[in-house]
Amino acid sequence: MSTKSIIIAGILCTMILSSCALGKKEQKDEKVFKSFITTDNGWKKYEGNPVLGGPEMGTCFDVNVIEEGGAKYNMYFSWRPQKSIALSRSDDGVNWSEPVIVLHENPDSGWEEIINRSTTVYWNGQYHMWYTGQVMRIQCSRIGYAVSDDGINFRRVTQEPVLVPERVYEGLSVMNPYVLRDDEKGVFRMWYCSGECYEPNVICYAESKDGIHWEKSPYNPVFYKGEEGAWDGDRVGGCEVHRLPDGRFIMFYIGYYDIDTARIGAAISDDGITNWKRLAANPLVEPTQGSWDGDACYKPSVYLDAQNGRWMLWYNGRCGAPEYIGLATHEGLDLGETE
């Protein structure tokens, strides 16, 4: 793309995002769902997107939404200008509180000059957070561990990373952790990404009894890119895994057509580790041309609203450089067959 084209595209994106930000501000007090933009596979983007972020806040990305903590929805997200992880809360998934930083970067550690891409689990009376620490000048990423009694004030359990790249397929980076607590097995289950630091290449799996010492799966990597030329044919990353009512596991993930073009898809596995099968309806959420997410739709965070029979999916979208948070929903719990 020519420099002139890039400048024009940037101006258009700024105009679009300014309009979206104004629309979001006007609806803040309404606390209701407006209309949605519908896709062919049943997923609908909220028309008031983005629901969090704007030019003043700067880039917000890689969200993780959980229920516990005094509000129905608690969104932990990466706040790029602050190099930190922040929390925003909401009663409806649309209108979010002003963010507060819950964990700052720690340049003195030598491995977390910036921190981002976190996952939080409420278990045994505490909030357990695993997060990505990065040193971009040497293109490396590690995973750290922190805990909190209130979900806001986190303290590091150890000053050292709890997961580091060791295998060939991990390259210089392990990042994007997503953790579930399995009380039956008495372990934490982690899905994480590895490979390159800018955008990872594959998805891997590990287990831990204490959240500090992790055993990586012999089946790693457990999830690869799609076929050449497919919507996710360049690489995969940024996943969340949920247990379905029938006992199977569903993974929502980022699929990359190329390094700059990303969409969101899903796959299903019986054990959450092996034999992942992509949904036939993929991609589930993709960029809307000319909109605030016109270049890429990244890292999904998903809530299964069984009471109302729907899925809620938050993601970070990009048009040009800035990234903000949007919402998509799917009425009905059935997401279709696998390929």
Segments (PLM) and residue ranges:
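Carbohydrate-active catalytic/glycan-binding domains of CAZyme proteins
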Residues: 20-339
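Bacterial N-terminal signal peptides that target proteins for export
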Residues: 1-7
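Bacterial N-terminal signal peptides
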Residues: 9-18
